[in-house]
């Protein structure tokens, strides 16, 4: 907390000095340089509070626009950042975490958005409030459409609902009318009412306010164009209220769609997700190849189905049937029936698509390296390393430092994995959970070290092979291979993913170890996907 306060005070001092340096002239700077530190601090504080009380005035500057979208999404009135916005940015940078994902890595989409935000103004409360006011003053049309949909399906105006059903049925049966609908709407809902406002009909004694004959001659009224509603108006308050109430429509829709996607598409149940993937892939392929023929053959059936479904859904929402339908849908019997059907379907899919794979169990290897002391003729530990350090290795030929540790307990599992300790009768020697590899022939063949190492069958040490030549009288030479001054043996330990349960880890590891024990001593070990261990 103290460091946070110190950072804030330092930011205040920096910003106050920047404001004072840009706002003052040379004389003021000379006077400020002669002041004491306490007086300069008080002057800076007064200047900060004055900047809060009075808006900062900056000369208008022209900004070179990099693209059309930058001009569209940036404010053209004010491009300067006030002191309040700078402090707000500092608070956000200190309060918000630097990452957005659980594993500590930024998503690619977040990084792309951050890169795009660099050419736009930063978050500002003033700009946010201005943009919100401008949006609310122009947000009447969506809320009017939502109200019309509610009126139609609530049967508040039965004739209006029936008219909508007839028009919708006509559009379904003859889809080409969808192209002509915007033209008719523009003519009869925009142009004709605008003409009637410019040429209002005279009052008729018999027809009263329904006289269809407009006034003759030139226009008798001014042009009434749509414009944003003012802030102090009832329509603005209605827009604010509707925005507050209709926000939950998007929230509920988002939550519903997300729940379905997470349950069926994100491998929460692998069998169901695989079945959906195969079904979607097959459907997409068939529609790509035979979609035109299938749709042309089924088009009449689709039209009739959509029309009947629209009428049935609208009639079901009638007040006389709505309460009965909702009671039936929200009843406990319906919920249990749907739950049983879904469970039965999931059980059938799990039975037919038994694709449960065995969990990954990997071997982690480490080599114990020792060298022969020429004075005492005793073997001394070099280190535990992931490199077997053969005689022809690059590190050994170039005298490079060998990475390792002196204690076996300090060896860490690979990232994303954790060790599992299993006691078996195959390896009786165990040190800190590590098991001695009793079949070194396997890893020697894997690393193509057959000609450079000699195996001690008793303790499973692998010695360097050194070739010595001896010359005899004449032209003959004798080769003799002896053991070198470095030996190593392999320790293994099993590791599993760190997201598994402990019971599953033990079961899978024991099964894996039993399969390994049944292999022949001359057989090759499985190729390991993890070959390095951090020491």
Swiss-Prot record:
Protein's UniProt name: Peroxisomal membrane protein PEX29
Coiled coil region boundaries: none
Protein species of origin: Ogataea parapolymorpha (strain ATCC 26012 / BCRC 20466 / JCM 22074 / NRRL Y-7560 / DL-1)
Null allele phenotype: Does not lead to any peroxisomal phenotype. Reduces the number of lipid droplets and leads to fragmented and clustered mitochondria. Also results in retarded growth and reduced mitochondrial activities.
InterPro entries hit by this protein: Peroxisomal_Membrane_PEX28-32 (IPR052816), TECPR1-like_DysF (IPR010482)
Signal peptide: none
Membrane topology value: Multi-pass membrane protein
Superkingdom of the source species: Eukaryota
Glycosylation site positions: 239, 271, 450, 515
A Pfam family per the record: Pex24p
Subcellular location(s) per record: Endoplasmic reticulum membrane
Predominant localisation class: endoplasmic reticulum
Protein family membership: Belongs to the PEX28-32 family. PEX29 subfamily.
Keywords: Endoplasmic reticulum, Glycoprotein, Membrane, Transmembrane, Transmembrane helix
Job of this protein: With PEX23, contributes to the formation of endoplasmic reticulum-mitochondria junctions which are important for mitochondrial function. Involved in lipid dropplets formation.
TM ranges: 139-159, 176-196, 247-267, 272-292, 297-317
Gene Ontology, cellular component aspect: endoplasmic reticulum membrane; peroxisomal membrane
Segments for region (Disordered): 511-535
GO BP term (any one): peroxisome organization
């Amino acid at each position: 907390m103290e460091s946070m306060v110190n950072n804030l005070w330092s930011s205040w001092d920096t910003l106050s000095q920047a404001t004072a340096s840009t706002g003052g002239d040379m004389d003021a700077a000379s006077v400020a340089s002669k002041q004491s530190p306490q007086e300069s601090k008080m002057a800076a504080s007064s200047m900060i509070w004055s900047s809060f009380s009075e808006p900062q005035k900056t000369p208008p500057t022209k900004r070179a626009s990099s693209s059309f979208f930058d001009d569209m999404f940036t404010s053209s009135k004010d491009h300067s950042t006030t002191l309040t916005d700078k402090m707000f940015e500092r608070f956000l940078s200190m309060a918000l975490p630097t990452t957005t994902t659980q594993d500590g890595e930024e998503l690619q989409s977040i990084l792309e958005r951050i890169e795009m935000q660099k050419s736009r103004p930063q978050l500002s409360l003033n700009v946010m409030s201005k943009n919100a006011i401008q949006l609310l003053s122009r947000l009447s049309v969506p809320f009017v459409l939502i109200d019309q949909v509610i009126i139609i399906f609530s049967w508040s105006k039965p004739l209006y609902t029936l008219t909508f059903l007839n028009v919708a049925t006509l559009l379904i049966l003859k889809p080409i009318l969808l192209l002509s609908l915007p033209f008719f709407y523009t003519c009869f809902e925009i142009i004709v009412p605008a003409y009637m406002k410019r040429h209002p009909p005279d009052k008729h004694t018999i027809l009263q306010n329904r006289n269809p004959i407009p006034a003759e001659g030139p226009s008798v009224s001014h042009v009434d164009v749509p414009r944003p509603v003012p802030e102090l108006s009832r329509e603005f308050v209605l827009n604010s209220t509707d925005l507050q109430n209709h926000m939950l429509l998007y929230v509920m829709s988002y939550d519903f769609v997300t729940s379905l996607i997470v349950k069926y598409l994100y491998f929460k149940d692998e069998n169901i997700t695989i079945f959906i993937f195969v079904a979607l892939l097959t459907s997409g392929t068939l529609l790509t190849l035979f979609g035109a023929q299938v749709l042309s053959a089924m088009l009449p059936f689709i039209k009739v189905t959509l029309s009947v479904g629209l009428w049935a859904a609208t009639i079901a929402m009638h007040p006389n049937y709505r309460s009965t339908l909702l009671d039936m849908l929200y009843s406990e019997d319906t919920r249990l029936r749907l739950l049983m059907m879904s469970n039965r379907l999931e059980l059938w899919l799990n039975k037919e698509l038994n694709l449960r794979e065995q969990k990954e169990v990997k071997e982690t290897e480490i080599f114990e390296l020792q060298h022969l002391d020429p004075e005492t003729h005793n073997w001394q530990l070099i280190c535990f390393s992931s490199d077997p350090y053969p005689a022809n290795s690059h590190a050994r030929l170039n005298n490079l430092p060998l990475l390792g540790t002196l204690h076996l307990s300090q060896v860490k599992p690979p990232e994303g994995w954790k060790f599992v300790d299993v006691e078996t009768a195959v390896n009786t020697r165990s040190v800190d959970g590590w098991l001695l590899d009793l079949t070194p022939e396997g890893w020697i063949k894997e690393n193509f070290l057959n000609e450079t190492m000699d195996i001690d069958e008793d303790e499973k040490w692998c010695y360097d092979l050194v070739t010595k030549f001896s010359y005899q009288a004449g032209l003959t030479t004798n080769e003799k291979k002896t053991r070198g001054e470095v030996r190593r043996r392999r320790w293994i330990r099993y590791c599993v993913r760190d997201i598994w349960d402990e019971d599953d880890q033990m079961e899978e590891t024991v099964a894996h170890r039993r399969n390994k024990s049944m292999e022949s001593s001359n057989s090759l070990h499985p190729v390991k996907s993890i070959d390095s261990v951090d020491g």
